[in-house]
């Protein structure tokens, strides 16, 4: 599982500790500049770790398995190495993983049929509110169930090399379809539950992967998921990726934000 590879690499003190995997957004393209203004880059110290989504000026949503001990985020970034005056840097004052996410599964182990990565989401409260601009904008949570067969867009800075984890310079986008959960049940040994979405290209070649975790899955123009987990190597035929199904967590997200305002 590729998110476990990333987590273990970070916990060992460096990205270069990751074993060989093919890990990037496959079959994607450079996102049009500033076309994903809700996209967040989540760092551990000064190393890029995961994607995220800006929900409002004070809160970022990401994956629970992106939990670390020292967060900082960038908003409004397109390219990691270009000077982008419109981008905003923020520290994080509080991290709140979903209480039902099983953090013990992040320990190194052989995947088992009983492994359940449900509830893979976490809220980050910014130490200073984001300035809402043309290139930094929040996105709304979904208000209804996503439709099977919807065209979805995922984005992130997943690795561009198959051996050493190295984020893409430019924000990458990829399009694929929302699939029945049964397709993912057949493809994965780990549990696929009703709080997950199954999405990808059954022909292979289009996928999210290590480094894309926590980033948005937008189907028919609506934020419906965040990248959670998938196969390693990524982009395999008949093995779609798994995304946290946000409609199932609207109440928890809103209640948590209200209690920690």
Swiss-Prot record:
Keywords: Disulfide bond, Glycoprotein, Hydrolase, Protease, Serine protease, Signal, Zymogen. Residues 19-24 form a propeptide. It catalyses: Preferential cleavage of Arg-|-Xaa bonds in small molecule substrates. Highly selective action to release kallidin (lysyl-bradykinin) from kininogen involves hydrolysis of Met-|-Xaa or Leu-|-Xaa. The keyword Thylakoid does not apply. GO terms for molecular function: serine-type endopeptidase activity. The active site is at residues 65, 120, 213. Its EC number is 3.4.21.35. Glycans are attached at residue 102. It comes from the Eukaryota. Residues 1-18 form the signal peptide. One of its GO terms (biological process) is proteolysis. Disulfide bonds join 31-173, 50-66, 152-219, 184-198, 209-234. CDD domains: Tryp_SPc. Gene3D superfamilies: Trypsin-like serine proteases (2.40.10.10). Residues 25-258 form the Peptidase S1 domain. Pfam families: Trypsin. InterPro entries: Peptidase_S1_PA (IPR009003), Peptidase_S1_PA_chymotrypsin (IPR043504), Peptidase_S1A (IPR001314), Trypsin_dom (IPR001254), TRYPSIN_HIS (IPR018114), TRYPSIN_SER (IPR033116). Glandular kallikreins cleave Met-Lys and Arg-Ser bonds in kininogen to release Lys-bradykinin. Belongs to the peptidase S1 family. Kallikrein subfamily. This is Kallikrein 1-related peptidase b5. It comes from Mus musculus (Mouse). The gene is Klk1b5.
């Amino acid at each position: 599982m590729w998110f476990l590879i990333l987590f273990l690499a970070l916990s060992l003190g460096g990205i270069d500790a990751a074993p060989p995997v093919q890990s990037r957004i496959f079959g994607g393209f450079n996102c049009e500049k500033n076309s994903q203004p809700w996209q967040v880059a989540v760092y551990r110290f000064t190393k890029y770790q995961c994607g995220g989504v800006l929900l409002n000026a004070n809160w970022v949503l990401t994956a629970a398995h992106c939990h670390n001990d020292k967060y900082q985020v960038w908003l409004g970034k397109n390219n990691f190495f270009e000077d982008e005056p419109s981008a905003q840097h923020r520290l994080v004052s509080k991290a709140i993983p979903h209480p039902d996410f099983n953090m013990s599964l992040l320990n190194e182990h052989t995947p088992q049929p009983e492994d359940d990565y449900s509830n893979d989401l976490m809220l980050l409260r910014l130490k200073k509110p984001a300035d809402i601009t043309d290139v930094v904008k929040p996105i709304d949570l979904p208000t209804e169930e996503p439709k099977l067969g919807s065209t979805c867009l995922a984005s992130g800075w997943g690795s561009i090399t198959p051996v050493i984890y190295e984020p893409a310079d430019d924000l990458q986008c990829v399009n694929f379809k929302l699939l029945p959960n049964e397709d993912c049940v057949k493809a994965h040994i780990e549990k696929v539950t009703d709080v997950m979405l199954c999405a990808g290209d059954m022909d292979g070649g289009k996928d999210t992967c290590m480094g894309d975790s926590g980033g948005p899955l937008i189907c028919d123009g609506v934020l419906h998921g965040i990248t959670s987990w998938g196969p390693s190597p990524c982009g395999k035929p008949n093995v779609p990726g798994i995304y946290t199904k946000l409609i199932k967590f609207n109440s928890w997200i809103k209640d948590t934000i209200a209690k920690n305002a």
